[in-house]
Amino acid sequence: MNVERKLESLSLQQQQQEEQQDESEQPNQGVEDEEEEEYDEEEYEEEEEDINFSKETLEAAMATKVSIEQYYTSLFKSLKERDDRRCFLEKKMEELNLREEQKSVKRRELDKKETEYIKSRRIRLTGHSFESIRIIGRGAFGEVRLVKMKKNNKFFAMKKLDKSKMIEKHQTIHVRSERDILADSNNIHGSNPWIVSLYYSFQDANFLYLIMEYVPGGDMMTQLIKYDTFTEDATRFYIAETVLALHSIHKLSYIHRDIKPDNLLIDQKGHIKVSDFGLCTGLQTNRVPTLAEIYKKYEGDNNIREEDQTPQSRSARFDSWKRQRRVLAYSNVGTPDYTAPEVLMKDGYSAECDWWSVGVIMFEMLVGYPPFCSESIRETYHKIMNWKQTLPKIMEEAKAEVNLSPEAQDLIERFLTDPMTRIGFNGVEEIQSHPFFKGVDWRRLRETRPPIIPQLSSPTDTSNFDHYEEEQQPEPMQPVQSKSRRKITSFDIPFIGYTYRNFDAMRDAFGSVNSRDAFGSINSREAFGSINNRDSLQGANM
């Protein structure tokens, strides 16, 4: 027994010694491990430094990343919109108390429409899909043409923008913003009646194309140049429609930022439609640069120039304003006359900046020229920046020249003030309840007879637009090649995912079933809404 106890005791001692030895070795082992890890990291860093990717590889990787993101974003949105169309159909059928067999027919018809739309998306649109009638607008980055679609002989306005100029002037975000809001304004309930409808957008190697609704009445600027001023009744109507149009844009969570008579189009019935969303931005985003960057070169001290070169008489101001108006409209810089000071100053701003622009337009309609107009952009810029000092004098001069009602003067002054106290800050109802709009039926405004109704001789009548000469023969189309024939570079990245195709428009042009016939005696637009979708990224369509 003693031997056994001694062996047990010895075994226990050896075990304790081994444990102590293990404990003493562990720190050393840890140091070795750390050294090993440090060595491995250094070796990895050295290997990493040796990896150099070419510019072409990096561009291809970025293009692939953007393409995949755009594809799946568009795919999931497409599936959601398809579900929305089905849900909308089911809801409408319930409201109409259709029998089950009738519902089955409508479901099959919608399924057929969806199939036709999917097939039509495979058809590539190009500039050759349209016949050019004439130019109806020209700007710094492109032109607008009245065109006829060869497939169905329908007329559209085609906006064609030069990619290289857009990139050179850093305008790619702006053109994408315009495309996005025009697409967003279409939904299962129909297109927004206050916004010019977008039917297709596509591109080739050199140009971007927006195929939009043709609005034959021209723009408000043309009418103001023609009539000089409007009566208060006419002004009341057009300002009321502009208020509702902007409210519909704000409800989409966008700010227009560039509301001016040039961008207020008049449709064939005389009602307003808003266009040109190049400076439009989201209510909660700063992705579009402030206009202060555009006018930066005109900045100086905050004092008004002691010698203002603006003509003092009203007739002289008329002549001066008309003389420079069109030139400014088509220049790279444009005019700051309608822009809110907080936008120019790069201060924080929201939807209220659009209400400032409405006040400027209202003043112009009643007086004949914008309140801050000057002989130079610099003078205009400084007058806006110092509006608290300049506006009182401007209003006094206007009252001496024009018989402004107290209600009109009050509304203008409540538009042209600080954002926090500007009318509309507390909601559009604040504007609608102003005494100037007494008697306006806001709910039936688009059913009210407008002051000016365009007199049109034909669907191709462009008499309400300026005349433009063809500068040169239209450039031949340069199709966007497939990836196997043409490498995508950084030049293409800003335009990936630009393609858009309206659901109803594609079916009308390329489908075999007429949307009105498909729903029998029920008008599809009235009963089921105008249905739209975005086109996903399809190979080289980008």
UniProtKB/Swiss-Prot annotation:
It is found in: Cytoplasm. The keyword Lipid metabolism does not apply. SUPFAM superfamilies: Protein kinase-like (PK-like). Gene3D superfamilies: Phosphorylase Kinase, domain 1, Transferase(Phosphotransferase) domain 1. Residues 130-437 form the Protein kinase domain. Residues 438-510 form the AGC-kinase C-terminal domain. InterPro entries: AGC-kinase_C, Kinase-like_dom_sf, Pkinase_C, Prot_kinase_dom, Protein_kinase_ATP_BS, Rho-assoc_Ser/Thr_Kinase, Ser/Thr_kinase_AS. GO terms for cellular component: cytoplasm. The active site is at residue 258. It comes from the Eukaryota. This is Probable serine/threonine-protein kinase ndrB. It comes from Dictyostelium discoideum (Social amoeba). The gene is ndrB.
